[in-house]
Regions:
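Hydrophobic alpha-helical and helix-loop surface patches within well-folded domains
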Residues: 177, 209-464, 591-592, 607-608, ...
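Acidic/His-enriched low-complexity segments
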Residues: 1-248, 349-353, 375-381, 392-397, ...
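Extended hydrophobic/aromatic-rich secondary-structure runs
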Residues: 97-100, 112-120, 125-127, 142, ...
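Short, glycine- and charge-enriched coil/turn segments that flank and shape catalytic ligand pockets
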Residues: 50-52, 87, 165-172, 203, ...
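Charge-dense, low-complexity polyampholytic segments
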Residues: 61, 338-339, 705-710
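Charged, low-complexity, helix-prone segments enriched in Lys/Glu/Asp/Gln
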Residues: 14-27, 144-145, 223, 327, ...
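Hydrophobic pocket-lining residues within nucleotide cofactor-binding pockets
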Residues: 182, 274-275, 692
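Non-catalytic accessory/interaction domains
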Residues: 67-68, 148-151, 213, 297, ...
């Protein structure tokens, strides 16, 4: 029998029966320098509301021994240990072994190729703690955790509560951490290794940042900014939620081979890819700020107050995604962060919400496996945008009042969505029951356009819209620019809403100006060409972003060509003044040229993008971003200029080599020489990325083996290598690998949720396929794990839209 996924009914029954008093977890890491094993002893003290009843504890690790109140237990073969004959108060002791920390979920051993040092991280969301030690792996059974960790003497061990007692034991040291506050199992963590550490004080908090030793110089470079952002975020959330972060110590640990970041209470784990080896661009620094504040928001929304079950996963993640942008705009230098959100995640969410995996933001979750499949664009950027609209709908002051009441009422407990709705409703005068049903329990996206009825402008919805507040901006030409003549907020609840207060005539009316709601828009028929032509002249980053969002949505819906969208985007880029959107817009238009344009149009559109990059490169503040864009789009002539401009910039040289390899240049010797002098411990991945782009059967075979079969590429680098592997114009070489992708589907979920999402989406072929292949892939995935199925269905729908766009003449 395979490892079973916990169902909601099982969780509710167990929660009604069991109250966990505490976890005492003893972990032995001393075998890791020379092998893959972790040994754990988990002691769980809990009470039972019905003495004599039976339940189970989760343990998908190898069970060496298990006793309940001194009586030996027999583990099942489904990742569970039956617990019969429960007493009123119980002590469960389970000794377990995780025999493989290289590919199994829950805990991961990484070896730094620079110096051979070993690092260990754990990451448990949604239910992967059970692969390491025995626990009640569900969010509502919160309890204090006391971790004791034995590790090699040269290592530092980090966990949630900080300030451990450390005992010397010869070649090892034993770290005993104080009790955590009541936490869900998935919010606990152990990170270990010979870290480079930096500490600062800020606002009464003891802040630490950690990375592997080979990245010490990079960590030192970025530490000031990380500490500044951390202090700003802690102060903002303390005021916004009327509750300071209750623990003095707040650590952030940058780990190798980690995907994304994880909000463990008081000890956030990051991928060390966020420590950029090259000087970070503005967009990369802004992303660092957004992720830092996202994970920090979880300290309150997720850790202090926790969802009762995974049907409120959306709220956990959407709230953190909303709050990080709210805090970044209000407390940091990244004041255009909502424009960046629109240019990136929100555009992805619009596309996802119109595809085969569109779902209500809040939906019943049968089991944890289903929960793992909705860490998606609807949960994150759409959810964040909906919460932004909720704050607009009720007013920010009342929103803050409601949030403060929510945290005061439910601290260290668990809640449902209704608890939050009740707190916000009590703080204001809005009926949120209708809002909740329309926004959270109904799938899909509203669409608005404008009609003119004499002198009256009518905002027209496609169907009955959700209750919302949005704005319509009126713009007039002033020379070569557009200036806003009026901005009218409109409260919408009916299919047709008159908009009063607009000028009698305007050169452009922009629906959803200021981007206050989550809705797609269409210009009126007479204004379509105007919007495409003058989007670049709009006066703010957010207004230009709203126009770009409309153009993008029309492209993905088959209502605009890639050439039209590309011309609009290149014009916007040439005029753009906000660093928050230049890089995401450049990525978007490059993707349009590569992935959406017909073969006949691709060279001209790619050349146009390269021309904008050369123009932007004349601005010293944007030179780095522009040259990176040039590295994706340059012809042989452009590459020569890129080489001249790159000088000793190792990052740009790697990027140029990828493009030169794709174009058929012999870069083998130069790649080897650059690998030799690149100080980045992960430079071998850059060399493999160059190799992946080479239009040669041997290069493709080697890359596929390392990327998809052996999985030696760190998960955070899979996307970059895969993008170099799947290149336009190489269909004959790539066609066999499209078939191999289908053969890989049954094992795409190996390694846990994050690898499953990454491998499924990034390896899906965008070239060397047709619409029949997309249908075959969608059929082949029907029996796969939910996270693989949903990820593949979403990605394949996007590729289907790309194929349609490529078949359309400009």
């Amino acid at each position: 029998m395979g490892i079973r996924s916990l169902t909601r009914i099982e969780a509710e029954r167990r929660s009604a029966l069991v109250t966990v008093e505490r976890y005492d977890v003893d972990i032995d890491l001393t075998a890791l320098p020379n092998g893959p094993e972790i040994r754990c002893v988990s002691t769980v003290t809990f009470t039972c509301s019905e003495p004599g009843a039976e339940t189970f504890v989760d343990c998908a690790a190898e069970v060496r021994s298990a006793t309940l109140n001194g009586t030996a237990l027999t583990p099942g073969d489904d990742g569970r240990i039956p617990l019969p004959g429960l007493a009123a108060r119980n002590v469960l002791r389970v000794e377990s072994l995780q025999a493989d920390t290289t590919t199994s979920p829950g805990a991961h051993k990484a070896v730094d190729p620079a110096d051979g040092e070993v690092y260990l991280w754990t990451s448990f969301e949604p239910d992967e703690a059970r692969f390491v030690w025995a626990c009640f792996d569900q969010p509502d059974l919160k309890a204090p955790h006391a971790f004791t960790v034995t590790a090699p003497a040269a290592w530092t061990v980090l966990s949630n509560s900080g300030d451990p007692r450390v005992e010397e034991q010869g070649a090892a040291r034993r770290w005993s951490f104080p009790d955590t506050p009541p936490l869900s199992v998935y919010n606990t963590v152990v990170n270990a290794g010979p870290f480079h550490e930096i500490r600062r004080e800020a606002g009464g908090h003891d802040l630490g940042v950690f990375a592997r030793r080979s990245l010490a110089e990079v960590l030192e470079r970025d530490a000031d900014e990380i500490f500044t952002l951390t202090g700003q975020g802690l102060a903002f959330f303390a005021e916004a939620f009327a509750m300071p972060f209750p623990q003095r110590k707040y650590d952030q640990v940058f780990m190798p081979e980690f995907g994304g970041a994880m909000e463990n209470y008081g000890c956030v784990t990051w991928s060390d890819m966020f420590l950029r080896r090259a000087t970070p661009t503005h967009a990369e620094r802004e992303l660092l700020a957004v992720v830092l504040l996202h994970e920090m928001a979880h300290m309150w929304f997720g850790n202090i107050v926790t969802m009762r079950w995974w049907d409120d996963l959306w709220l956990n993640e959407a709230f953190a995604e909303f709050a990080c942008h709210w805090a970044a705009e209000g407390a940091t230098r990244y004041t255009d962060v909502w424009a960046g959100h629109l240019a990136g995640g929100k555009l992805r969410a619009y596309l996802s919400d119109q595809g085969p995996v569109s779902h209500p933001i809040h939906q019943p979750i049968h089991d944890v496996a289903q929960a793992a499949s909705i860490f998606d664009s609807i949960t994150y950027p759409k959810g964040a945008s909906v919460l932004q609209q909720l704050m607009t709908y009720v007013g920010e002051d009342r929103f803050r009042t409601g949030m403060a009441a929510y945290f005061a009422r439910h601290a260290w407990g668990t809640t449902t969505l209704q608890d939050l709705i009740d707190a916000l409703a009590e703080a204001g005068d809005r009926d949120l029951a209708t809002w909740r049903k329309a926004w959270l329990e109904t799938a899909g996206t509203d669409r608005f356009t404008l009609e003119h009825d004499g002198s009256t402008v009518i905002l027209v919805a496609d169907g009955t819209p959700r209750p919302q507040v949005l704005a319509v901006g009126a713009y007039d030409r002033t020379g070569d620019a557009l200036e806003r003549a009026a901005l009218v907020r409109v409260e919408v609840s009916e299919p047709r809403t008159p908009v009063t207060g607009l000028p009698a005539t305007s050169d452009l009316l922009l629906i959803n100006d200021d981007d206050l709601t989550f809705a797609t828009t269409r210009p009126d028929p007479a204004g379509r060409d105007t919007l495409f032509r003058v989007a670049a002249r709009l006066p703010t980053a957010i207004s230009r972003g709203v126009a770009v969002a409309t153009v993008w949505d029309m492209l993905t819906a088959g209502e605009a060509t890639a050439a039209e969208a590309g011309r609009c985007l290149t014009a916007v880029l040439a005029a753009e003044t906000s660093d928050a959107v230049i890089e995401p817009f450049l990525t978007l238009v490059t993707n349009i040229a590569e992935l959406w344009a017909p073969d006949a149009d691709r060279p001209a559109l790619t050349e146009a993008v390269a021309g904008v990059c050369l123009q932007l490169a004349d601005d010293p503040g944007r030179r780095q971003v522009a040259l990176r864009g040039l590295a994706r789009t340059a012809t042989a002539e452009g590459l020569a200029r890129l080489r001249d401009q790159a000088d000793d910039d190792v990052d740009l040289r790697w990027r140029a080599l990828v493009r030169e390899a794709e174009l058929g240049g012999d870069v083998t010797a130069e790649s080897a020489a650059l690998l030799e002098r690149d100080p980045d411990p992960d430079a071998w991945v850059r060399a493999l990325t160059v190799r992946a782009a080479v239009p040669d059967p041997a290069a493709k075979a080697e890359t596929w083996q390392r990327l998809a079969v052996d999985r030696t590429v760190p998960v955070q680098s899979v996307g970059a290598v895969a993008a170099a592997f799947w290149r336009p114009g190489q269909d004959a070489l790539l066609a066999p690998y499209a078939e191999r992708y289908l053969a890989e589907i049954p094992r795409l979920d190996q390694g846990g949720m994050i690898p499953a999402m990454v491998y499924t989406s990034q390896l899906f072929p965008p070239y060397a396929i047709d619409s029949a292949y997309v249908e075959r892939a969608q059929q082949a995935v029907q029996e796969a794990a939910p996270v693989v199925r949903n990820t593949l269905l979403e990605r394949s729908d996007t590729v289907r839209r790309m194929l349609r766009a490529r078949a359309v003449n400009a």
